[in-house]
A protein has these predicted regions:
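Active-site glycine/GP-rich loop and adjacent strand/helix microenvironment
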Residues: 1-26, 148-408
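Nucleotide 5′-phosphate-binding alpha/beta core
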Residues: 1-116, 121, 199, 350-355, ...
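Phenylalanine-focused residue identity feature
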Residues: 33, 47, 68, 115, ...
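Hydrophobic alpha-helix position signal
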Residues: 37-39, 47, 114-115, 145, ...
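AMP-binding/adenylate-forming
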Residues: 100-116, 125-184
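Helix N-cap / loop-to-helix initiation motif
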Residues: 121-122, 324
Length: 408
């Protein structure tokens, strides 16, 4: 790809506007949800006047018109797949439909952008360490591997030990899972005496959490699995939005398939290949810093500096200092004796109190160093408390690192 330049940006913008204008007529004609909110778009000024859309808007629509809402451009019998959001934020999950064309788009974006950016080829064997539930992320990874021509290997209905042994037995070279689950595989591999770094794995693609863009977490995974990590971003209702490149200093957003904006530090996205249930100017809730500059990987696409480091609703406050779980994780993962952690945030007499709960390896207590490192790096005093092994939850999908406790 050519390097980022004015000419490449002009080309990207022209292609985006062309695809938007090609897709909108059918939406305006038959999609009840968008017909009330949109008008025809002739140029970028028209586009920027369109209203922002929120997840609350989508949830309200599905509650008013169950089970799938009114964001449907085609008759119901045109749709071939249904998935739903993880519901990890505590909210009711969204259900999302795809027609055959939209699902083909998902697979193609994974194959052409996510896998190729992670240097995955048709010769690879891709192991997908997840259960085949309604969450779309790894279904699309499986379909993308097929689209690429790689061997797609399901890790469904397996224990972590079985997955580790299967990876070695079948010669898997690529792993797809959450960052938290990758660290769980490292932990279990050590417990059962398997040399996981000695397996054929060479690449790991992570999604669902910011971990693969957090330097200390990425380093722990790479050392523990013997792989090179790549971060992937996406949303069930939106699509596969980005992937880190060989430089791994951020995530390139896939501008050939989406329109991206940064509004008050939040990522706003419009998909351009999912017209059966499109999203236009959608507030993702992800806090970002976008930067457009030449990248040595050759991508012309805008970069999220440091990756998606957190969601706006994940912010918590310690004595007036605003923090995100990813900032705490970056410090915690520098201490290899910490096996798992959880942040507890509570209000006591109108004051914020934060406690970091940690599980550690036998006989090693890093609490004093942790307290000191957290205070020095974040400018906040955070209580640290060790808990017995096995106390904190292990997650296969998105890990919840922040536990909010009601006012006392």
């Amino acid at each position: 790809m050519p390097g980022s330049s004015t000419s490449s940006l002009d080309r990207i913008r022209s292609d985006q506007l062309g695809r938007l204008r090609a897709g909108l007529p059918a939406v305006l004609r038959s999609n009840r949800f968008w017909r009330q909110r949109l008008h025809d778009v002739m140029g970028w000024d028209d586009f920027e006047r369109l209203p922002l859309t929120t997840k609350a808007d989508l949830m309200a629509d599905q509650q008013a018109h169950p089970p799938f809402g009114t964001n449907l451009t085609h008759p119901g019998d045109r749709y071939v797949r249904v998935h739903q959001t993880s519901g990890s934020s505590g909210a009711r999950p969204l259900r999302w439909l795809d027609d055959a064309e939209s699902w083909s788009w998902w697979r193609r974006v994974w194959a052409d952008h996510v896998y190729r950016s992670a240097e995955v080829t048709p010769a690879d064997r891709v192991f997908l360490a997840f259960s085949f539930g309604p969450f779309i992320g790894f279904w699309s990874a499986f379909g993308g591997a097929e689209e690429l021509g790689a061997l797609a290997i399901s890790g469904g209905a397996m224990t972590t030990e079985q997955r580790i042994r299967t990876i070695a037995e079948v010669g898997a070279t690529v792993l797809c899972c959450t960052p938290t689950y990758a660290l769980r595989m490292v932990e279990v591999g050590r417990e059962i005496g398997v040399d996981v770094p000695g397996s054929p794995l060479r690449v790991a693609i992570h999604a669902g959490e910011p971990g693969a863009s957090i330097p200390s977490t990425r380093a722990a995974i790479e050392a523990g699995l013997g792989v090179r990590c790549f971060d992937h971003t996406g949303m069930t209702e939106l699509g596969p939005t980005g992937v880190s490149c060989s430089q791994r200093d951020g995530v390139h957003l896939i501008e050939s398939e989406f329109i991206f904006e940064e509004v008050d530090g939040e990522l706003i996205a419009t998909n351009l290949g999912r017209w059966g249930s499109p999203l236009i100017r959608y507030r993702t809730g992800d806090r970002v810093e976008l930067r457009r500059e030449p990248c040595s990987c050759g991508s012309p696409f805008v970069k999220v500096v440091g990756g998606l480091r957190g969601r706006l609703d994940d912010m918590f406050t310690v004595r007036g200092v605003n923090l995100y779980p990813s900032q705490v994780e970056d410090i915690v993962r520098r201490h290899p004796e910490v096996v798992e952690f959880m942040i507890e945030h509570r209000r006591l007499r109108h004051m914020d109190e934060v406690t970091l709960l940690v599980e550690t390896t036998d006989g090693q207590s890093p609490l004093e160093r942790l307290r000191s490192d957290l205070r020095q790096a974040l400018g906040a005093r955070i209580n640290c408390r060790e808990v017995p092994a096995g106390t904190l939850p292990r997650a296969e999908l998105k890990a919840q690192r922040l536990r909010r406790i009601a006012d006392q």
